[in-house]
UniProtKB/Swiss-Prot annotation:
It is found in: Cytoplasm. The gene is rsmA. InterPro entries: KsgA/Erm, rRNA_Ade_diMease-like_C, rRNA_Ade_Mease_Trfase_CS, rRNA_Ade_methylase_Trfase_N, rRNA_adenine_dimethylase, SAM-dependent_MTases_sf. Keywords: Cytoplasm, Methyltransferase, RNA-binding, rRNA processing, S-adenosyl-L-methionine, Transferase. It comes from the Bacteria. Belongs to the class I-like SAM-binding methyltransferase superfamily. rRNA adenine N(6)-methyltransferase family. RsmA subfamily. It catalyses: adenosine(1518)/adenosine(1519) in 16S rRNA + 4 S-adenosyl-L-methionine = N(6)-dimethyladenosine(1518)/N(6)-dimethyladenosine(1519) in 16S rRNA + 4 S-adenosyl-L-homocysteine + 4 H(+). Coiled coil: none annotated. It is an enzyme of class 2 (transferase). HAMAP family: 16SrRNA_methyltr_A (MF_00607). This is Ribosomal RNA small subunit methyltransferase A. S-adenosyl-L-methionine binds at H13, L15, G40, E61, D85, N105. One of its GO terms (molecular function) is 16S rRNA (adenine(1518)-N(6)/adenine(1519)-N(6))-dimethyltransferase activity.
Amino acid sequence: MKLVKPKKFLGQHFLKDLKVAQDIADTVDTFPDLPILEVGPGMGVLTQFLVKKERLVKVVEVDYESVAYLREAYPSLEDNIIEDDFLKMNLQRLFDGHPFVLTGNYPYNISSQIFFKMLDNKDLIPCCTGMIQKEVAERIAAGPGSKTYGILSVLIQAWYRVEYLFTVNEQVFNPPPKVKSAVIRMTRNETQELGCDPKLFKQIVKTTFNQRRKTLRNSIKPILGKDCPLTEDALFNKRPEQLSVQEFIHLTNQVEQALKVPIEPVSQIENP
């Protein structure tokens, strides 16, 4: 069976350490009754341990060479190997609208986009695990006051409990990346309603962190208008990295009450 050559433009770094693959596979065990979707299986190093769990497993892979390899290596998965771009998929159709666990050795170049899609489908994904760049994992798990605390931290922690599980050395990949990796698990918290307008919440989080050196007074003024009395609140003396998720929710409610003009659509705010 011909091996697949990693493609740089797809951000492929194939995992070759079986112990690490087994450890990643075991992170899905917190939801033993749910089906599993693996993103970016490559040559199936992680897949081989997922299928042993005797659960419905589907894999989605955009690389046609990897798909051909998987179909030959895992004939029992034939009907569940999906050649597609995960970011463009309708996840409602995957398991007939039922929830599932998301996992994978995620490509570095789209990991943030994967997690934004997870947030858009949070009612379908009660648990997301997998391996990403260590720096991104630290950002997601960071708390207020940390230099790595940012947009992903707040948006994900609003809906998920984040666990930084373990760090992975560069040498367990082919080719070795230039940075370390980490395995994380994100589990849906008890939040059903955010307690504020979710679109405005997202807009405020992105707007303030895109100007993270400014105080909230200066970063929010373009939204509220320079003469809005709300900016006299002491909260506006803080910078975004000083605010907890709950404080961002409180801020969103204050801004919503003060707004006199239509809100700029979130789609026009640039992703990090």
